A protein has these predicted regions:
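ATP-dependent helicase/translocase motor core
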Residues: 1-33, 37-51, 68-72, 92-113, ...
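Alpha-helical elements of the RecA-like P-loop NTPase motor core of helicases
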Residues: 13, 64, 143
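Conserved catalytic network of the ASCE P-loop NTPase/AAA+ motor domain
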Residues: 46-48, 74-75, 125-128, 156-159
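Conserved RecA-like ASCE P-loop NTPase motor core of nucleic-acid helicases/translocases
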Residues: 51-59
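Loop/turn-to-beta-strand initiation segments
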Residues: 52, 130-133, 161-164
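Conserved helicase ATPase core of P-loop NTP-dependent helicases/translocases
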Residues: 117-123
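Conserved two-lobed SF2 helicase motor
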Residues: 128-146
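SF2 helicase catalytic motif II
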Residues: 138-141, 153-174
Length: 174
């Protein structure tokens, strides 16, 4: 499989050391240097290839790319859950050129914004021996919050907390 390049190994090592004492951090890398891959390798390292990860992105096209990349490059098979409003994306007005491609994205797993459906998928993957990754657009954060609230309530707080949250293109968040 794919092997990390030198600059990615340095980033992974720095992240490993940094997260021993911190619970938040930034990974800043130039375009085309493999941030998505590096984030996956950091997640696998920090969580010993097992845990619940939230991967946030600004657009559905980026969600599809990230999902495909993580599933292709993961050490152990990933259980992916996609949270986005496909219907809203496909009705996007073409003038919104920033995310024009959203309407033609084919996601590898069905997408939803229904909190009950999200909670059901999370429960289904609870004992998965690998990473369970919730891939979501920022605009769907409320659906994740509602699903997480439901699962934490059902499991008396024993399941549903994210072990790691990755915010891609975080500089675009408000």
């Amino acid at each position: 499989g794919k092997q990390p390049r030198e600059h990615q190994l340095r980033a992974m090592s720095a992240a490993h050391a940094y997260f021993q004492d911190h619970d938040r951090g930034k990974l800043i890398m130039a375009c085309g240097t493999g941030k998505t891959y590096t984030a996956l390798k950091i997640a696998e390292d920090l969580l010993n290839n097992k845990g619940l990860v939230l991967f946030m992105v600004p657009s559905i096209s980026l969600l599809g790319q990230s999902l495909n990349a993580w599933c292709a490059d993961a050490v152990n098979p990933i259980k992916g859950i996609c949270i986005c409003s496909d219907s809203r994306a496909s009705r996007k007005i073409k003038k919104d050129f920033d995310d024009t491609q959203d309407s033609i994205v084919d996601l590898a797993v069905p997408a939803t914004t229904n909190p009950k459906s999200i909670a059901k998928q999370l429960k289904l993957y609870r004992n998965h021996n690998g990473l369970t990754v919730v891939f979501s657009t920022y605009q769907s954060i409320e659906a994740i919050h509602a699903a997480q609230h439901e699962i934490l309530k059902e499991t008396a707080g024993t399941y549903g907390k994210f072990d790691l949250i990755v915010c891609d293109e975080a500089h675009r968040t408000t």
